[in-house]
Amino acid sequence: MNPSVKKKRVIHQYREGQFTCKTDEVVEEFPLTVIVNGEEFVTLVCSPDHLKELVIGFLASEGVIRFENEIKRFTIDESMGFAYVDLVHSSEFQSSDFTKRVIGSCCGKGRHFYFLQDVKTAKTAIDRINISADTCMRLMKSLQEESQLFQHTGGVHNAGLCDTEKLFITRTDIGRHNALDKIYGYCLLHQIPLRDKILVFSGRISSEVLLKAAKLGVSIVISKSAPTELALNMAEELNITTVGFVRGESFNIYTHHQRITE
């Protein structure tokens, strides 16, 4: 665990009718401003680890890049909180394209997206992957066992990428979207294909989280928490299996149940 992501702090804890003084661990919160082609693009408030993965994953999720080799230069000044990105095809980047809200359509039905780039980058999932109910629960258990920073602080979200057998990468962050972007960035940097992968997640499956999963291209999203109705509507259209409330020996399948077998 990167020591920069948490700090020790003396606190006064009230329990069973009395105060005691103790040392607790608290997560760090770090603002990182991303400069693309000399222009301020976004400030990400994040946990200060795996920052290159975070920036690359975020840019890919937003449709700024598709592959890591579209970046000509990349530098991070952690002391000042800046990441500098120069694109190979700089003339194709227009920051104004990333602030336009849009309602797109698919197969004759209205599909709601937040921004124009969501229409371009969300992928419809493939059908060739399926897992057993036991695997569903085992993958969630593996994510929880790997989540040391959460166990120490209780202040982060956890995300993991799996194949049909095992969990092979995990990332944590104070922002649930950041944890997903770190995974996306890692996969781009290491050229890991995503179309046959499964996303395991600690937080609520909101519409934004579902869109992140669709942009990765995963077919199954597994969470220990609840989904939202808008997220489930999107999952239906994008052919994504959503599994929520994975706790102990039970869970709920909300969409495209055919991928989860007994």
From Swiss-Prot:
* Pfam families in the record: FdhD-NarQ
UniProt keywords, alphabetically:
Cytoplasm, Molybdenum cofactor biosynthesis
Localization, per the record, is: Cytoplasm
Query: Example GO molecular function term?
Result: sulfur carrier activity
Gene Ontology CC, one term: cytoplasm
The answer to whether the entry has keyword Phosphoprotein is: no
What the entry lists under NCBIfam families is as follows: fdhD_narQ
Q: What does this protein do?
A: Required for formate dehydrogenase (FDH) activity. Acts as a sulfur carrier protein that transfers sulfur from IscS to the molybdenum cofactor prior to its insertion into FDH.
Give the protein name, as stated in the record.
Sulfur carrier protein FdhD
Organism of this sequence: Bacillus pumilus (strain SAFR-032)
